[in-house]
A protein has these predicted regions:
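Acidic, proline/glycine-enriched N-terminal capping motif
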Residues: 1-154
Length: 154
């Protein structure tokens, strides 16, 4: 863990963005149990987290101890029902992915930051600014773009 001046980490993961799954509760043999499902939107959440960590390490992530801000940009493939034959959005289609099945922005953010805990920062209390954007991937591949920078850097 280090204190690094002018810390900046920026990377992209070309994969379908996944929201952090909600904890589930079950009773097994009379004992309550809390667990987080691994299957999210038909994909392995653990594999998704490993993809994020691998991209961050490749981009030079260090577990720093400085005030940080994060920007997460999630680009998702729109359902075919929203597209014309030429691949553009229908005029009746919503511009941004806001349906419940598209996932909550805060859960996308939580999935990324939880994956990077201890890899790109020491504790999530270091974040003083957070931003998440969800948009359709019409002109490029779906994926997530992550930028984490020390507060005060331009």
């Amino acid at each position: 863990v280090k204190a690094v001046e002018n810390y900046l980490l920026s990377f992209e993961v070309k994969t379908k963005p996944l929201p952090q799954p909600r904890p589930r509760f079950a009773t097994i043999a009379g004992h309550p149990r809390v667990y987080t499902p691994n299957n999210v939107m038909g994909r392995s959440f653990n594999l998704y987290k490993k993809e994020i960590v691998a991209a961050a390490v490749k981009a030079g992530a260090e577990a720093v101890v400085v005030p940080l801000e994060a920007q997460i940009r999630c680009r998702m493939t729109p359902p075919r029902s929203l597209l014309r034959k030429d691949g553009t959005l229908k005029s009746s289609a919503r511009t941004y992915p806001i349906a419940q099945r598209d996932g909550d922005g805060d859960n996308f953010l939580k999935a990324v930051l939880d994956s990077l805990l201890g890899i790109a920062f020491k504790d999530d209390s270091q974040f003083v600014g957070l931003s998440v954007t969800k948009e359709w991937a019409l002109d490029s591949e779906e994926g997530i773009h992550v930028t984490i920078r020390e507060v005060g850097l331009a």
